[in-house]
Amino acid sequence: MIDAWAIKRALCIFILINCVLKLGRSRKITWKPKKGVYIPLDDANGCKGEWKRKGVFFNIQSGKKGKRLKGRKGLRRGLVTRGTPQFRRDKFIPLFLLQDCEHRSLNGKQYNLRGRRCSSPLDVNPRGWDILPPEQPNEETIGERIGERIGEAEQLEDEGLDGGPPPGMEAKKSSSSSSSNNVHSNCSDAGKAPVCSQENIRNFCILAHIDSGKSTLADRFLELTKTIKKKKMQDQFLDMMSLEREKGITIKLKAVRMNYKNYIFNLIDTPGHFDFYHEVKRSLSVCEGAILLIDGTKGIQSQTLNIFMELQKHNLKIIPVINKIDLNICRLEKIENDLLNKFHFMKKDILHISAKYSHGVESLFQRIVSEIPSPAIKSNSFFRAIVFDSFYDQYKGVILIIKVLNGVLTKKTEVFFIQSEKTYIIQEVGYLTPEMKPTESIRQGDIAYVSSNIRKCDEVQMSETIISRDIVHLNAQRRLVVDSDLLRRNPSGEEHINVKRCNIDSSLGGVAPRMERIEREVNLEEIAASKVDVSYPVVFCNIYSVNDKQANELQAALNKLKLNDASFSFKPDVCETLGKGFKCGFNGLLHLNIIQERIKREYDVETIVTAPSVNYLIRVKEKCIDKQLKERLIDASFDIANINVEGGDHDDCNDNGGSNSDDRSDRSGKNPPDGLYYMTSNVNDIPQKNYIHGIYEPYVRTSIMTPEEYQKYIMAECFQRRGIFIKKESMDSHIIFYFDMPLSEILINFLDQIKSCTKGYGSMSYENFITYRESDLHKINIYVNNRSIDSLSFLAHKLNYQEKGKRIVLKLKEMIKPHQFLVVIQAGIGTRIFASERINPLRKNVTAKCYGGDITRRRKLLEKQSAGKKKMFSIGKVKLPPNMFTKLFDLKAQ
C-alpha cells in the first residue's frame, strides 16, 4: 500500500528541487576566481569562453581538459551562461579577443558575454574602460601577450583581484580619454606635471550680480572641457559647502583648472552677494581677465556697477556676456543698449549665451583664448608666489592656494615666507581640478595649492609671499640676506640683497640654480608681491559659547574660519553675564549668519551672538579722562590722520541738497578737529556725555537702482533712515540713486524695505569707503528688574531713539517667559526711563482652600504670597533665551 505521506513528501521534495533549479538559472552569479580554481588559457585548449585578468586569460567553462574547474563546486558546464550574470571588474573582456561569440553592448563598446540570455544591454559600466583600438590584433600578438603574462597566474591572489584594470586597458584608457578631452598633445592632464607653455595659460574669473548664473556657467565649463565626468556632474558643482546648496548662493571663491585644446584655463567662481565682496577682490588680484555676466531678465543692477568699477581699477580685460537668452522675458536689446551707453562696450564685443543649455559657451571659449592675456612671464628668475586663499585639512594641515608669479616649485623644496619670516619644506604641490590632484612641479602662471604640514593657523597670513629658501637666509640680527656678505647698507640707507639666477630651460622641466650673481641689486620691496585686496570688517558683535567648557573649542573653530576667510577677524573678550567670548568683525549680517552656522555645523559648538554694532569714533575731553578710560584709550590708539572725518549733522537731506560730485577724492583728506580720539564698536566703552566732545558714526556711499515708478518710495525710505542725497542718474527706464547712508541704518532690514518698496525690482549696494560724520547719538540702556543688561545696550539717533527703545522693550516682553516673580523691562538714557513693560508673575491660588469664615484669613494668605513675590523680585534671576539677540535685532540675512 502506497503511503500517502511518502507521496506528499516526495512531491514536496520534487517541487523544492525544481524551484532551486529555476532559481539557479535566474540568479546573478558573482564568480571570483581563487588560486587553484582557474586554468590558464594555454592549458585549456578548445574552451568556448575565456576571461582576462591583469593580462592573463582564464577559462571559466569546461574544455577538453576537464569538465569542471579544480576545487570549485557548482561551476559545471554551461552554468555561467544561465540567467543574467552580474559582471564585476574582472568579468568581461573585449569582443575581439574572442571570435564567434555572442555579445552585448556596453556604452557603445562590445564585450563577450557568451550565453543564450545575453540580449539585453548592460545598464552600468563596471569599470568605465574606453573602446579599444578598432583594428583587431592577430593571433601572434595575442599569443605573445598571453606568454608574457602567463607567469603572473600564481601571484593573482597575493596581489588582489579587484585592484584595477589590466595594464593594457589602463594605457588604452589614458590614450582614449586624452583624445576625447580634445587636449593638445603638448598639454598634459591637470593632475600631472604641466608641460604647456606659459603663453597658453588663461587665468580669469566670473563676476556678476546675485542669481545671474555664475555657478551654472561654471558647470558648463566643467562639462564641455570634460574636467568632470558626466555621471558625477550635478548642478552648482563648485558649491560644495552644504550651506551653499541650502541657501542657493555661493559663499567661497572656488578655483579649478581645466584643459581646453592646447590651453589651460584657471577659472575662479566668485560669490555675488555684497557681504562676500572680499572674495571678488581677492580673485581679481590673481587674474588677467574677467567675464562680466549680466542677467538677461534683469539687466544691469547696482552690484554690476561696483564690479565694473573694480575691474577698471585692476585694469583687467573684460568680456561682457548676457546670460539667460533662452527665457521669453529676456530683454536683449535693452540690455545691449545699456551696456553700450553706460559701460561703453562695442556691440560686437557682447556675447549672448544660455549657460543652462550650453548655447554660445563654445564662442565664449574662443573669446577667452583670443582676448584674455597670458600671465606675465619672467624668465631666469627664482621661485616666487603669492597666497590668496587657504583652508585647513585634518591630515595635511594648512593648505595654501597660491599663484606662481615666477620660477618653478617642486616637492621637498625649502621655501621662505617673507611676512612671517619662517621656513618650511613643501610636502605636496598640485592643482585643483576641483579636487586636489598632486603633481611633481608647478611653474609660473599656475594657480595651484601647496602643503607644508603647517599646523598653526596663525602662521599664515593673506598676501603672504613665498620665495625659494636657497636665495635667502636669516642672520643673527634676523635680517633677510642671501649670504652673510651680501646684505649691506648703501649711503641712502636702503637695504638690498642679491639673488641667484635660475635657468628655466632645463631639459627636465625644472629649474637649475646658477651660482653667478646678477649685476643689479634686488630691493626687498621688489621681492615681496603686491598685496591681495582684503576687505575690512564693518559689522561687529560678540560671540560666546552656550557651554563655558567649549570656549577653547570655539577659539580653535574661529582660528580655522579666519584661515579660510580673510575678512573675518576676532579677539578675546570677557563678559560678566556670558563669560569668555570673542569680539568678531564681519562684512555684513549675512556674513555673520554664515559664520555662526558654520561654527555649529562644522565644529559642533552652540553659540550666543550679541547685538551687531559698527565702529564709532569718539572725541574725548582730555581734562575729563579718568585713569580707567586712559588705559582703554592707550589700547585703542590709532592714527586719526588716516580717518576721513566730517563734522556736524547734515540737514541737507532733501532732493535739492547734498553734493553733486561722486568723486571719491572729494570725500577724502578732511582734517578732523583737534583733540583725543579713539574708536570702538562696544557701546559700553563710550563714556558719559560730560566726558566727550562728540560721537562720529560711519557713513557709506550707497547706490540704489529702481524702476522710475518707485522712486518716491525709495527717497522716502532713505530720508527716514537719515540718508544724505548725493545725485541720481537715469538709465533707460531705471534710476540710480546715490546716498550717503549711516552704516548702522542700512545693515538691518534696509534691503528688505527696498525690495518691498519696488516689488522686488530694486537692488542696493554700498562701497567700502567710509566717512565719519558727527551725529547726535544717545546710548540706550536696557534694564531687566533694575539691572542693566550691557549686551543689550545700543546707540540711537535723537530722531528715533524712543521708537527703537520701545520696540526693543516690546520684543523682550514677548520673548521672556513668565517667572514666579514680577519682571520689569525698561529702556532709558542714563537714569531717565522712557519705555517700560511688565510681565506679571505666575501665581498659585492660595485661597482655594478657604470656603468661608472671616475675610482676614483670606487677606493673610494673599499678603504672605505678595511678600514672597517681592523677596523673589529682589534676589531672583531672569532667564533670557539664548537666541534672543537674533530675534531682537532682526538679524536676518540680507
From Swiss-Prot:
Binding residue positions for GTP: 208-215, 269-273, 323-326
Family: Belongs to the TRAFAC class translation factor GTPase superfamily. Classic translation factor GTPase family. LepA subfamily.
PROSITE patterns: G_TR_2
GO annotation, biological process: positive regulation of translation; translation
Protein function: Promotes mitochondrial protein synthesis. May act as a fidelity factor of the translation reaction, by catalyzing a one-codon backward translocation of tRNAs on improperly translocated ribosomes. Binds to mitochondrial ribosomes in a GTP-dependent manner.
UniProt source species: Plasmodium knowlesi (strain H)
Membrane topology type: Peripheral membrane protein
SUPFAM superfamilies, alphabetized: EF-G C-terminal domain-like, P-loop containing nucleoside triphosphate hydrolases, Translation proteins
Protein name per Swiss-Prot or TrEMBL: Translation factor GUF1 homolog, mitochondrial
